[in-house]
């Protein structure tokens, strides 16, 4: 399986390439990508530099233009598609039908991948995107069970890519507008669950508080690790009980599922984390490269594949809340 790794900056891109990525994915420094954070992402000059670095080492490069344009901003998304095509990226990762349609019509030689933000959860949707836009691959949402992924793989007309490690989203990607209730912006339109301008951190007598547009999201005791302040992972007072009402901070880790994902025909596994540091990217990619190489070496006897304890420990140390989960892949309900 192909190892697809995050590149939120040029140093992170180098870290991914140097530690074994088969492919890296990046976004431009604007609202056209779903990791639009201050100080991250690429302008044209940095993108050219990153693409040259990756390609000189045999690594493919994908460009994520995976938010949903608003009427007044269509030209920004148009220009992003044109730039990606001009840079000759290996594929464009898109979600919006208008963006995919424009790319397919104006740049027919540009390979298209359906973003996880496209929320394709059944093979009829995959057929539609294949017929209308000739997509080559689809990234599946993180809300599907392994049985559902296997069913899709049997019928899909395109390659499938799944998330393997990183921040876990409990929503069906591309359909979450939760943060817009507080900030008037959402990851689907502006590229960030919690826009930096709305985030505030404050040391108080009760602990470190995180606020989103002045609404208290969480409070951390001394020595407690603070997480990224999103509404879905905040602690709330529910009938007198304060707890993570929607989701506890944790990270997806599917090392144990590598043989199963391989056997059902998954083409690529994706590491989430374009907002993460180069050191984070380097360590995660290194572990996943070792695991995939071991699985490949044992392809004739996949039952012998065993995850090394130090791999899991290394990933746990880098995870949100210092815990990991296999998420929806092994849920008992469908």
Q: What residue ranges belong to the model's regions?
A:
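A cross-taxonomic marker for long C-terminal extensions/tails that follow the last structured domain
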Residues: 132-137
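Active-site pocket-lining/capping segments in soluble small-molecule metabolic enzymes
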Residues: 1-120, 139, 147-268, 274-334
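Conserved nucleotide-cofactor-binding alpha/beta core module
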Residues: 122-125
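Contiguous mid-protein beta-loop-alpha structural module that forms a pocket-lining wall or clamp
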Residues: 143
